C-alpha cells in the first residue's frame, strides 16, 4: 500500500512537471483572454461535469468573492449550480442541452465560456461550446487526453489548455491547479500587488 501511495504522488508530480513545460503559453493566453473580456465589461460563464463542475464552481466563486486577496468582485457564473434549471431542462429529455440553453440565454458577444472536460467529449459541454460560438463568445477549454471533440470546435481566438496525461485523476488535479493559476494571473493583472 505504501508503494501505491508513493506512486500516486510521483505520477502527480511528473504530470505537473510535464504541464509546467508544455502549458505556460496556453495558460498565459487564456488568462489574457479572460482579463480582456473582464476589462471590456463582459462576463465569464463556466461549466463542467462531476469534478470538472467543482472546478467551474471554484473558478466562479474565486471571481465573485476573491482568490487570495481582497479586490472588487468580477462577473462569473457557474452554469452547473442551479439545480432547478438543470433538472427542468433534463426533465424535458434535453440532457445534452443543460448548459447550451443557459449559454444562449446568458451569453453575449465578448463573454468567455470556460469549458472544463477531462476527455473533451461530454455532450453537454460540446453543445455549450457550439452555443457559445453562435453567440460570438470566446472559449477557454480545459481538457486532457487528446482534447476530444471539444478541441475540434475551437477557433483561432479560442484557447485550449490540454493537460499532457491520459489519466483522469491526474488531469482533474491539473485542472484545479490551472484554475488556481488563472485566478492568480487575473488578480495580479487587474489588481497588481503593491510592494510594501
Curated annotation (Swiss-Prot):
Biological processes annotated in GO: carbohydrate derivative metabolic process; DNA replication; positive regulation of DNA-templated DNA replication initiation
Keyword set includes Heme: no
Keyword Nuclease among UniProt keywords: no
Similarity comment: family membership: Belongs to the SIS family. DiaA subfamily.
Organism this protein belongs to: Escherichia coli (strain K12)
Substitution effect: residue 191 to L/S: Abolishes interaction with DnaA. Strongly reduces DnaA-dependent DNA synthesis
A Pfam family per the record: SIS_2
Subunit structure: Homotetramer; dimer of dimers. May be in a rapid association-dissociation equilibrium between homodimers and homotetramers. Formation of homotetramers is required for stimulation of replication. Interacts with DnaA.
Annotated region (Important for interaction with DnaA), positions in chain: 190-191
PANTHER family: DNAA INITIATOR-ASSOCIATING PROTEIN DIAA (PTHR30390:SF6), SEDOHEPTULOSE 7-PHOSPHATE ISOMERASE / DNAA INITIATOR-ASSOCIATING FACTOR FOR REPLICATION INITIATION (PTHR30390)
Keyword line: DNA replication
CDD domains: SIS_GmhA
Annotated InterPro entries: DiaA, GmhA/DiaA, SIS_dom, SIS_dom_sf, SIS_GmhA/DiaA_subfam
Outcome following mutation: residue 101 to E: Abolishes association of homodimers into homotetramers. Strongly reduces DnaA-dependent DNA synthesis
Protein name: DnaA initiator-associating protein DiaA
A GO CC term attached to the entry: DnaA-DiaA complex
Effect of residue 190 to A/P: Abolishes interaction with DnaA. Strongly reduces DnaA-dependent DNA synthesis
Recorded name of the encoding gene: diaA
SUPFAM superfamilies membership: SIS domain
GO molecular function terms noted in the UniProt entry: carbohydrate derivative binding; identical protein binding; protein homodimerization activity
Effect of residue 52 to F: Abolishes stimulation of DnaA-dependent DNA synthesis
Residues annotated as domain SIS: 34-196
Described purpose of this protein according to its UniProt entry: Required for the timely initiation of chromosomal replication via direct interactions with the DnaA initiator protein.
Amino acid at each position: 500500500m505504501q508503494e501505491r501511495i508513493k506512486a500516486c504522488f510521483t505520477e502527480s508530480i511528473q504530470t505537473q512537471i510535464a504541464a509546467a513545460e508544455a502549458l505556460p503559453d496556453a495558460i498565459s493566453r487564456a488568462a489574457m483572454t479572460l482579463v480582456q473580456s473582464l476589462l471590456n465589461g463582459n462576463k465569464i460563464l463556466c461549466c463542467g461535469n462531476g469534478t470538472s463542475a467543482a472546478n467551474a464552481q471554484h473558478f466562479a466563486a474565486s471571481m465573485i468573492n476573491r482568490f487570495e486577496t481582497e479586490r472588487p468582485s468580477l462577473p462569473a457564473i457557474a452554469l452547473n449550480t442551479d439545480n432547478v434549471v438543470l433538472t427542468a431542462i433534463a426533465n424535458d429529455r434535453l440532457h445534452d442541452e443543460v448548459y447550451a440553453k443557459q449559454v444562449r440565454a446568458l451569453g453575449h458577444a465578448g463573454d468567455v465560456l470556460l469549458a472544463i472536460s477531462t476527455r473533451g467529449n461530454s455532450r453537454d459541454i460540446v453543445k455549450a461550446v457550439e452555443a457559445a460560438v453562435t453567440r460570438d463568445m470566446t472559449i477557454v477549454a480545459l481538457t486532457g487526453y487528446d482534447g476530444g471533440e471539444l478541441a475540434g470546435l475551437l477557433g483561432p481566438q479560442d484557447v485550449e489548455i490540454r493537460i499532457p496525461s491520459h489519466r483522469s485523476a491526474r488531469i482533474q488535479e491539473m485542472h484545479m491547479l490551472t484554475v488556481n493559476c488563472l485566478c492568480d494571473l487575473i488578480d495580479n493583472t487587474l489588481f497588481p500587488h503593491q510592494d510594501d
